[in-house]
């Protein structure tokens, strides 16, 4: 009787004499990205701190003022080479332009010289999903993340003068936020 009881205990403790072994393999993958990138706006490729200065408009001739180019560059903290790997964590990168009052239906709002001058700002990169005039209704430009990770977005700005423009100086501002999703 003692033998049968001991055998039964061993049988139950070992799982009925049947042993199961399973190998499970779990693979994790992740993108490691820099968490902080900083922005530099180069005006006319001169590193002009994001300030564009347009030529003089002569109302008597009505000739347009030549456009000016500017580039938005992104750098990872401490880097001297442009690029922002943080975009690789998303699927689309977006530059969203304009705080309240900076854009209207005609473009970037300016003050001075009659207050009717607008600045037509457009993305020029082929990878931009929108290359029309930035306005209050169309103020976002999206890019593929592989392009955005290179850290360079190019734009062109051109002032548009109304017929009743007055002599004087004008100025405007356009802010933007860079995001990725």
Curated annotation (Swiss-Prot):
<dbReference type="InterPro" id="IPR008966">
    <property type="entry name" value="Adhesion_dom_sf"/>
</dbReference>
<keyword id="KW-0614">Plasmid</keyword>
<dbReference type="InterPro" id="IPR016372">
    <property type="entry name" value="K88_fimbrial_pA"/>
</dbReference>
<protein>
    <recommendedName>
        <fullName>K88 fimbrial protein A</fullName>
    </recommendedName>
</protein>
<comment type="subunit">
    <text>K88 fimbria, 0.1-1 micrometer in length and 7 nanometers in diameter, is composed of about 100 identical subunits.</text>
</comment>
<keyword id="KW-1015">Disulfide bond</keyword>
<keyword id="KW-0732">Signal</keyword>
<feature type="signal peptide">
    <location>
        <begin position="1"/>
        <end position="21"/>
    </location>
</feature>
<dbReference type="InterPro" id="IPR036937">
    <property type="entry name" value="Adhesion_dom_fimbrial_sf"/>
</dbReference>
<keyword id="KW-0281">Fimbrium</keyword>
<dbReference type="GO" id="GO:0007155">
    <property type="term" value="P:cell adhesion"/>
</dbReference>
<feature type="disulfide bond">
    <location>
        <begin position="37"/>
        <end position="84"/>
    </location>
</feature>
<comment type="function">
    <text>Fimbriae (also called pili), polar filaments radiating from the surface of the bacterium to a length of 0.5-1.5 micrometers and numbering 100-300 per cell, enable bacteria to colonize the epithelium of specific host organs.</text>
</comment>
<dbReference type="GO" id="GO:0009289">
    <property type="term" value="C:pilus"/>
</dbReference>
